[in-house]
Regions:
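PRPP-associated nucleotide enzymes
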Residues: 1-151
Length: 151
């Protein structure tokens, strides 16, 4: 879709974590070498989320994207809260910002310019459908979680 449009981004901005793999694929497909990421926490589980999305450090330095044509990439536009936060941040600094997602839900606040499919259902992606293989222990490094044979 993006490749067949007249939009030629100078920067691909992937939203971590769900948008990292689609952003990398998009960067290769469009031959864009400048790839950045922005970590945003919003979802804490299946259909569980914080009240508002929060940008996590390290924050993207606006000087790195100043004046650029940016394509923001994520896996899904569910409520659109994450994309709105990132798009609003970019809009203050860049020449143009557009969004690309694999899936867009009808309730999304942001209507993305590039959408592979639209759905009202929960989407499970291969990179996020399984539980983490490590657990966080307070004050310690990550500890491996035993993987059962039924995974």
């Amino acid at each position: 879709m993006v490749a067949h449009s007249d939009y030629r981004p100078g920067i691909i901005l992937g939203i971590a974590r769900g948008g990292l793999l689609p952003a990398a694929a998009m960067a290769y497909a469009l031959d864009v070498k400048n790839v950045f990421m922005m970590s945003v926490e919003f979802y804490t589980g299946v259909d569980e989320r914080l009240d508002l999305p929060v940008m996590l450090p390290p924050l993207l330095d606006a000087v790195d994207i100043a004046g650029a044509r940016v394509l923001v990439v994520d896996d899904v536009a569910d409520t659109g809260g994450t994309l709105k936060l990132v798009k609003d941040f970019c809009a203050e600094h860049v020449a143009n910002v557009r969004c690309a997602v694999l899936y867009e839900k009808p309730r999304s606040l942001v209507k993305c310019e590039y959408v592979w499919k639209r759905t009202a259902h929960w989407v499970n992606f291969p990179w996020s459908s399984q539980a983490p293989v490590v657990t966080h222990l307070p004050g310690r490094a990550l500890s491996p979680t035993p993987i059962s044979s039924d995974r």
